[in-house]
């Protein structure tokens, strides 16, 4: 139970708005998100929403329905003398009619599939499944290889920074292109982390070209214009 709210923490996290550790400014964290809004809004826009979790000693199960209007009492059971499996499982039935749909569209399905691959690529130590099939990505390099015709054209490195992985290839768009993640959150517009790595690569590469090919006048900006950069970063925020 939560010390002050007098309710189980899973119910507080998944069934009540404005409850999340991200509200606190003190301390640093390596997570993203919007105060748990994703899970709560999923509950609100679902006909049925079930949370199951276990710490190996106790299992917890709770069900909401009717767009979070109805909340059943949680089922809490001891695992007994034998230490059980630690897990968290969220199952939901989206209220498609609320959005004017009768089935999940191909566009939404493709978006979900892309996000599943994002999760697998950023967390290679976690088994991630899509429609019951294991997404076989053993590293961020494997994930980056999905975006180029030839995986051998991708150069990868961790830069010696824990939580960072970088992959770079030539851009097929004849201009600087990129995708990136910060704390497992997709940063489609890039940002300081992308510019930092791009400049870190382009400047010395331009110098190397100038030294080995004096007749060429290549600038870092020109190198960057032919770069396809993929970055996974962990940043304390």
Residue spans of the language-model regions?
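Pseudouridine synthase
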Residues: 13, 45, 50, 196, ...
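GHKL/Histidine-kinase-like ATPase module
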Residues: 72-76, 109-237
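Structural motif corresponding to the C-terminal cap of alpha-helices
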Residues: 17-25, 205-212
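GHKL-type ATPase core
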Residues: 1-9, 20-146
